Amino acid sequence: MIVKLNYVFIKKLIFFQLCFFIFFTSPLYSELLKNKKFPDSNKFLNVNVGLSTLSAPKYEGSSKSVSRIMPFFDLKYKNITFNPVMGLNVNFLDNQDWLLGYGLGFNFGRDPESDVNLNGLKKVNSTFEPKLKAKYKTKYYSITSEISYDLLKRGHKGAYLKTSFNTGFPLIKLKTFIIPSFSFTYADKIYLNNFFGVDDRENLSSGYSKYNLESGIKNISASLMVIYNLNDRISINSNLIYKKLVGHVANSPLVSKSDGISTIFSIVYKY
Protein backbone atom coordinates (compact mmCIF):
# COMPACT_ATOMS: atom_id res chain seq x y z
CA MET A 1 0.00 0.00 0.00
CA ILE A 2 1.41 3.40 -0.96
CA VAL A 3 1.10 5.99 1.80
CA LYS A 4 0.90 9.57 0.61
CA LEU A 5 1.95 12.23 3.12
CA ASN A 6 1.77 15.90 2.32
CA TYR A 7 5.03 17.84 2.17
CA VAL A 8 4.31 19.99 5.21
CA PHE A 9 3.66 16.95 7.40
CA ILE A 10 6.94 15.31 6.29
CA LYS A 11 8.86 18.49 7.17
CA LYS A 12 7.28 18.53 10.62
CA LEU A 13 8.26 14.90 11.24
CA ILE A 14 11.86 15.54 10.21
CA PHE A 15 12.02 18.62 12.44
CA PHE A 16 10.66 16.79 15.49
CA GLN A 17 12.96 13.82 14.91
CA LEU A 18 15.97 16.14 14.81
CA CYS A 19 14.94 17.85 18.04
CA PHE A 20 14.31 14.57 19.83
CA PHE A 21 17.66 13.13 18.64
CA ILE A 22 19.42 16.05 20.33
CA PHE A 23 17.60 15.32 23.57
CA PHE A 24 18.24 11.56 23.31
CA THR A 25 21.98 12.17 23.50
CA SER A 26 21.88 14.90 26.17
CA PRO A 27 24.04 14.45 29.31
CA LEU A 28 21.03 15.50 31.41
CA TYR A 29 18.97 12.52 30.28
CA SER A 30 21.91 10.17 30.80
CA GLU A 31 22.32 11.48 34.35
CA LEU A 32 18.61 10.96 35.00
CA LEU A 33 18.80 7.27 34.15
CA LYS A 34 22.01 6.80 36.08
CA ASN A 35 20.41 8.20 39.26
CA LYS A 36 17.14 6.32 38.63
CA LYS A 37 15.05 9.45 39.17
CA PHE A 38 12.71 8.86 36.28
CA PRO A 39 9.01 8.73 37.43
CA ASP A 40 8.87 4.98 37.78
CA SER A 41 9.05 2.82 40.87
CA ASN A 42 10.44 -0.58 41.74
CA LYS A 43 7.98 -1.11 44.60
CA PHE A 44 5.85 -4.25 44.46
CA LEU A 45 2.64 -2.21 44.73
CA ASN A 46 1.96 1.20 43.17
CA VAL A 47 -1.46 2.86 43.14
CA ASN A 48 -2.14 6.17 41.39
CA VAL A 49 -5.51 7.94 41.51
CA GLY A 50 -6.65 11.31 40.23
CA LEU A 51 -8.86 13.28 37.89
CA SER A 52 -8.45 13.78 34.13
CA THR A 53 -9.95 15.99 31.46
CA LEU A 54 -9.94 14.69 27.88
CA SER A 55 -10.60 16.41 24.57
CA ALA A 56 -10.51 14.31 21.39
CA PRO A 57 -12.19 13.85 17.99
CA LYS A 58 -15.66 12.31 18.31
CA TYR A 59 -14.44 9.33 16.26
CA GLU A 60 -11.50 8.72 13.94
CA GLY A 61 -12.02 10.91 10.89
CA SER A 62 -14.52 13.23 12.59
CA SER A 63 -14.24 17.01 12.34
CA LYS A 64 -16.02 17.37 15.70
CA SER A 65 -14.47 17.06 19.15
CA VAL A 66 -15.83 15.94 22.50
CA SER A 67 -14.60 16.76 26.00
CA ARG A 68 -14.97 14.65 29.13
CA ILE A 69 -13.98 14.71 32.78
CA MET A 70 -13.19 11.29 34.21
CA PRO A 71 -11.46 9.69 37.20
CA PHE A 72 -7.91 8.43 36.79
CA PHE A 73 -6.78 5.10 38.22
CA ASP A 74 -3.62 3.09 37.69
CA LEU A 75 -2.54 -0.01 39.60
CA LYS A 76 0.76 -1.88 39.42
CA TYR A 77 1.50 -5.01 41.44
CA LYS A 78 4.81 -6.71 40.70
CA ASN A 79 4.58 -7.54 36.96
CA ILE A 80 0.83 -6.79 36.65
CA THR A 81 -0.61 -3.41 35.67
CA PHE A 82 -4.18 -2.21 35.23
CA ASN A 83 -5.92 1.01 34.27
CA PRO A 84 -9.27 1.61 32.53
CA VAL A 85 -7.66 2.92 29.33
CA MET A 86 -4.87 0.37 28.73
CA GLY A 87 -6.67 -2.55 30.38
CA LEU A 88 -4.92 -5.43 32.15
CA ASN A 89 -1.29 -6.25 31.33
CA VAL A 90 1.10 -8.92 32.57
CA ASN A 91 4.83 -8.74 31.82
CA PHE A 92 6.32 -12.24 31.68
CA LEU A 93 9.80 -10.98 30.73
CA ASP A 94 11.35 -7.69 31.84
CA ASN A 95 15.11 -7.28 31.81
CA GLN A 96 17.58 -4.54 30.92
CA ASP A 97 17.01 -4.84 27.17
CA TRP A 98 13.62 -6.46 26.61
CA LEU A 99 10.07 -6.44 27.91
CA LEU A 100 7.50 -8.98 26.73
CA GLY A 101 3.92 -8.83 27.92
CA TYR A 102 0.38 -9.97 27.32
CA GLY A 103 -2.75 -7.99 28.05
CA LEU A 104 -6.47 -7.60 27.60
CA GLY A 105 -7.99 -4.30 26.51
CA PHE A 106 -11.36 -3.04 25.36
CA ASN A 107 -12.42 -1.49 22.04
CA PHE A 108 -15.56 0.65 22.23
CA GLY A 109 -16.39 0.23 18.54
CA ARG A 110 -18.56 2.85 16.81
CA ASP A 111 -22.24 3.70 17.16
CA PRO A 112 -23.80 5.17 13.97
CA GLU A 113 -26.39 6.95 16.13
CA SER A 114 -23.68 9.02 17.82
CA ASP A 115 -23.20 11.36 14.85
CA VAL A 116 -25.31 12.45 11.89
CA ASN A 117 -22.40 11.73 9.51
CA LEU A 118 -22.61 8.03 10.45
CA ASN A 119 -26.30 7.62 9.67
CA GLY A 120 -26.98 4.52 7.58
CA LEU A 121 -23.69 2.82 8.47
CA LYS A 122 -23.50 -0.47 10.34
CA LYS A 123 -22.70 -0.50 14.03
CA VAL A 124 -19.23 -1.67 15.05
CA ASN A 125 -19.84 -3.41 18.37
CA SER A 126 -17.54 -3.05 21.35
CA THR A 127 -15.27 -6.01 22.03
CA PHE A 128 -12.35 -7.29 24.09
CA GLU A 129 -8.88 -7.17 22.55
CA PRO A 130 -6.00 -9.43 23.64
CA LYS A 131 -2.68 -7.66 23.19
CA LEU A 132 0.81 -9.09 22.75
CA LYS A 133 3.55 -6.54 23.40
CA ALA A 134 7.32 -6.51 22.83
CA LYS A 135 9.55 -3.62 23.88
CA TYR A 136 13.24 -3.11 23.15
CA LYS A 137 14.92 -0.76 25.63
CA THR A 138 18.19 1.15 25.39
CA LYS A 139 19.76 3.90 27.46
CA TYR A 140 18.23 6.69 25.39
CA TYR A 141 15.04 5.34 23.84
CA SER A 142 12.67 2.40 23.54
CA ILE A 143 10.78 0.80 20.64
CA THR A 144 7.48 -0.94 21.34
CA SER A 145 5.30 -3.08 19.07
CA GLU A 146 1.88 -4.27 20.17
CA ILE A 147 -0.52 -6.45 18.19
CA SER A 148 -4.23 -6.48 19.08
CA TYR A 149 -7.14 -8.47 17.69
CA ASP A 150 -10.88 -8.90 18.20
CA LEU A 151 -11.23 -11.73 20.71
CA LEU A 152 -15.01 -12.20 20.39
CA LYS A 153 -15.19 -11.58 16.62
CA ARG A 154 -18.27 -9.46 17.25
CA GLY A 155 -16.73 -6.00 16.92
CA HIS A 156 -14.32 -4.90 14.20
CA LYS A 157 -13.36 -8.60 13.71
CA GLY A 158 -9.84 -7.65 12.61
CA ALA A 159 -6.35 -7.04 13.94
CA TYR A 160 -3.85 -4.20 14.03
CA LEU A 161 -0.23 -3.56 14.97
CA LYS A 162 0.97 -0.38 16.67
CA THR A 163 4.69 0.44 16.77
CA SER A 164 6.00 3.31 18.91
CA PHE A 165 9.33 5.06 19.33
CA ASN A 166 9.68 6.67 22.78
CA THR A 167 12.18 8.57 24.87
CA GLY A 168 12.21 10.85 27.91
CA PHE A 169 14.30 13.53 29.56
CA PRO A 170 14.09 15.77 32.64
CA LEU A 171 13.93 19.54 33.04
CA ILE A 172 13.91 21.95 35.97
CA LYS A 173 15.99 20.08 38.56
CA LEU A 174 14.56 16.68 37.62
CA LYS A 175 11.03 17.67 38.73
CA THR A 176 9.63 17.95 35.21
CA PHE A 177 9.80 15.10 32.71
CA ILE A 178 9.25 15.39 28.96
CA ILE A 179 8.22 12.18 27.17
CA PRO A 180 7.88 12.47 23.36
CA SER A 181 6.92 9.59 21.10
CA PHE A 182 6.16 8.71 17.48
CA SER A 183 3.98 5.82 16.39
CA PHE A 184 2.23 4.26 13.42
CA THR A 185 -0.58 1.72 13.23
CA TYR A 186 -0.88 -1.02 10.60
CA ALA A 187 -4.29 -2.72 10.31
CA ASP A 188 -5.67 -5.62 8.30
CA LYS A 189 -8.38 -5.07 5.70
CA ILE A 190 -11.15 -6.48 7.91
CA TYR A 191 -10.50 -3.87 10.59
CA LEU A 192 -10.15 -1.04 8.05
CA ASN A 193 -13.29 -1.92 6.10
CA ASN A 194 -15.41 -2.16 9.25
CA PHE A 195 -14.38 1.34 10.34
CA PHE A 196 -13.67 3.13 7.05
CA GLY A 197 -15.20 1.05 4.24
CA VAL A 198 -18.65 1.32 2.63
CA ASP A 199 -20.29 -1.90 1.42
CA ASP A 200 -23.30 -2.37 -0.88
CA ARG A 201 -25.87 -2.13 1.90
CA GLU A 202 -24.28 0.95 3.43
CA ASN A 203 -24.07 2.54 -0.01
CA LEU A 204 -27.87 2.33 -0.28
CA SER A 205 -28.70 3.25 3.32
CA SER A 206 -26.19 6.08 3.84
CA GLY A 207 -25.66 7.56 0.39
CA TYR A 208 -21.88 7.22 0.66
CA SER A 209 -20.05 5.83 -2.37
CA LYS A 210 -18.87 2.22 -2.13
CA TYR A 211 -15.36 2.06 -0.73
CA ASN A 212 -13.11 -0.93 -0.13
CA LEU A 213 -9.71 -0.96 1.56
CA GLU A 214 -6.76 -3.35 1.64
CA SER A 215 -4.45 -3.93 4.59
CA GLY A 216 -2.05 -1.07 5.25
CA ILE A 217 -0.96 1.77 7.51
CA LYS A 218 -3.94 3.44 9.15
CA ASN A 219 -2.38 6.40 10.89
CA ILE A 220 0.80 8.11 12.03
CA SER A 221 0.89 10.00 15.30
CA ALA A 222 3.18 12.07 17.51
CA SER A 223 2.66 12.81 21.17
CA LEU A 224 4.28 14.86 23.89
CA MET A 225 3.69 14.07 27.56
CA VAL A 226 4.80 16.41 30.35
CA ILE A 227 4.89 15.26 33.98
CA TYR A 228 5.49 17.84 36.71
CA ASN A 229 6.07 16.46 40.22
CA LEU A 230 4.76 18.90 42.83
CA ASN A 231 6.14 16.62 45.54
CA ASP A 232 6.73 12.91 46.15
CA ARG A 233 2.99 12.21 46.06
CA ILE A 234 1.29 14.63 43.69
CA SER A 235 2.00 15.22 40.00
CA ILE A 236 0.38 17.19 37.20
CA ASN A 237 0.39 15.38 33.85
CA SER A 238 -0.48 16.65 30.39
CA ASN A 239 -0.43 14.88 27.04
CA LEU A 240 -0.76 16.37 23.56
CA ILE A 241 -1.40 13.88 20.74
CA TYR A 242 -1.45 14.61 17.01
CA LYS A 243 -2.84 11.82 14.82
CA LYS A 244 -3.09 11.77 11.02
CA LEU A 245 -4.97 9.18 8.99
CA VAL A 246 -2.98 8.32 5.86
CA GLY A 247 -3.25 6.65 2.47
CA HIS A 248 -6.53 4.97 1.47
CA VAL A 249 -7.89 5.46 4.99
CA ALA A 250 -7.62 9.25 4.71
CA ASN A 251 -9.43 9.10 1.34
CA SER A 252 -12.44 7.22 2.75
CA PRO A 253 -15.76 9.04 2.23
CA LEU A 254 -16.38 8.53 5.96
CA VAL A 255 -13.43 10.76 6.86
CA SER A 256 -14.41 14.40 7.31
CA LYS A 257 -10.99 15.39 8.65
CA SER A 258 -7.87 13.29 8.25
CA ASP A 259 -5.97 14.73 11.21
CA GLY A 260 -6.87 15.66 14.75
CA ILE A 261 -5.49 16.69 18.11
CA SER A 262 -6.27 15.11 21.46
CA THR A 263 -5.35 16.59 24.85
CA ILE A 264 -5.31 14.98 28.27
CA PHE A 265 -4.74 16.82 31.54
CA SER A 266 -4.53 14.96 34.85
CA ILE A 267 -3.84 15.55 38.53
CA VAL A 268 -2.48 12.35 40.07
CA TYR A 269 -1.88 11.24 43.65
CA LYS A 270 0.62 8.43 44.17
CA TYR A 271 0.06 6.08 47.11
What are these regions (language model features)?
Residues P57-Y59, V116-G120, S148-K153, G207-N212, ...:
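Extracellular loop and loop/strand-boundary signature of outer-membrane beta-barrel proteins
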Residues V49-S55, M86, Y102-F108, S145-Y149, ...:
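Transmembrane beta-barrel strands of outer-membrane/channel proteins
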Residues S30-N83, L88:
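Short glycine/proline- and aromatic-enriched beta-strand/turn motifs that initiate or cap beta-hairpins
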Residues N91, H156-N237, K243-V249, L254, ...:
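Outer-membrane beta-barrel transmembrane domain signature
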Residues V47, N79-F82, W98, Y140-T144, ...:
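Repeated loop/turn-to-beta-strand initiation elements of outer-membrane beta-barrel proteins
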Residues M70-D74, F165, S258-Y271:
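Outer-membrane beta-barrel "beta-signal"
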Residues S41, S63-S65, F82, K122-S126, ...:
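Short sequence motifs at beta-strands and strand-loop junctions characteristic
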Residues M1-K43:
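Cleavable N-terminal export/targeting peptides
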